[in-house]
């Protein structure tokens, strides 16, 4: 394998023979020099011929590695973490096995990275043919590429899935950011909210060109109604502790970031019986700052006020 690896593409795989074939075919036609790209397919003990299909591309893709698991973990976190352990590229790019990228994607992304010197390059999403997965443009609203953005000044809080984002590996390594292996929903949120907290600047490619196409809806759709409040509060508290412990962030930056994330998580947390109180007990000293923060929305203000009024007390 070449020592000059620019990008590590990480693909978790489980029983997606057709999807992995299409994805790897599209990687074969990249305009970018694929000698500078490693592709890590991390299989979670597929029971179909997905792994065999992937091995057929070994001669076409010079730096293809296939990791095989002895047991099925039941999610994407374990396969992704195994791939992170061996990744060598300057950049990480996560792609789901049902999805694919267009031939100019890597070239455009690295060109933007070199120009901007940003820590993250985000690719706008497009729906693949026959996909019924919802498509939101709110996080990718510019037709042209925008660089040198601060997270607080974007709408990337509406894009908390890790796919389609080039992330500097040194940032993930420095801050020991991993995917959680003890929850089954919103693992991406756990990982990406921590990344968003510590990247200094971000580029978002314009949607005038096609980049990342996704196919199937996630096994558990990421909606407020089917994310268990106990998991939602677990994720938020983990991110809260991570952000609070970052010495390179100012206190104002920490509160800005925590407020933005709480806006997204309020409805999920307040829907539980015990989750609101667990959240309140853990974050109470900071809530008076959050409630006055410039980024807070009305729904979150009401939630915090009701917490202080005791309206979520399980004994009421």
PLM-predicted stretches and their roles:
Residues 69-87:
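Glycine-rich, basic loop-to-helix element that forms the pyrophosphate-binding segment
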Residues 1, 36, 270-316:
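Membrane-interface aromatic/basic loop that binds lipid-linked glycans or pyrophosphate carriers
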């Amino acid at each position: 394998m070449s020592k000059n690896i620019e990008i590590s593409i990480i693909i978790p795989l489980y029983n997606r023979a057709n999807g992995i074939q299409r994805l790897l075919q599209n990687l074969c036609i990249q305009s970018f020099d694929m000698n500078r790209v490693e592709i890590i397919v991390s299989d979670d003990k597929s029971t179909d011929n997905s792994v065999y299909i992937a091995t057929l591309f070994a001669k076409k893709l010079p730096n293809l590695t296939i990791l095989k698991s002895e047991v099925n973990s039941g999610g994407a976190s374990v396969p992704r973490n195994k791939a992170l352990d061996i990744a060598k590229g300057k950049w990480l790019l996560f792609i789901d096995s049902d999805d694919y990228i267009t031939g100019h994607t890597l070239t455009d992304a690295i060109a933007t990275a070199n120009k901007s010197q940003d820590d993250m390059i985000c690719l706008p999403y497009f729906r693949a043919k026959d996909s019924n997965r919802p498509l939101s443009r709110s996080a990718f609203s510019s037709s042209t590429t925008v660089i040198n953005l601060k997270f607080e000044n974007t709408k990337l809080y509406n894009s908390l899935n890790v796919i389609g984002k080039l992330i500097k590996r040194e940032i993930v390594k420095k801050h020991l950011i991993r995917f959680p292996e003890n929850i089954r929903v919103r693992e991406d949120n756990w990982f990406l909210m921590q990344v968003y907290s510590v990247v200094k600047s971000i580029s978002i490619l314009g949607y005038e060109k096609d980049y990342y196409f996704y196919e199937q809806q996630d096994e558990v759709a990421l909606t407020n109604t089917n994310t268990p409040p106990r998991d939602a509060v677990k994720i938020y508290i983990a991110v809260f502790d991570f952000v609070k412990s970052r010495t390179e962030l100012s206190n104002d930056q920490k509160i800005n970031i925590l407020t933005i994330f709480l806006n997204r998580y309020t409805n999920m947390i307040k829907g539980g019986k015990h989750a609101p109180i667990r959240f309140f007990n853990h974050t109470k000293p900071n809530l008076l700052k959050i409630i006055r923060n410039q980024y807070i929305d009305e729904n979150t203000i009401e939630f915090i006020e009701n917490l202080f009024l005791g309206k979520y007390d399980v004994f009421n």
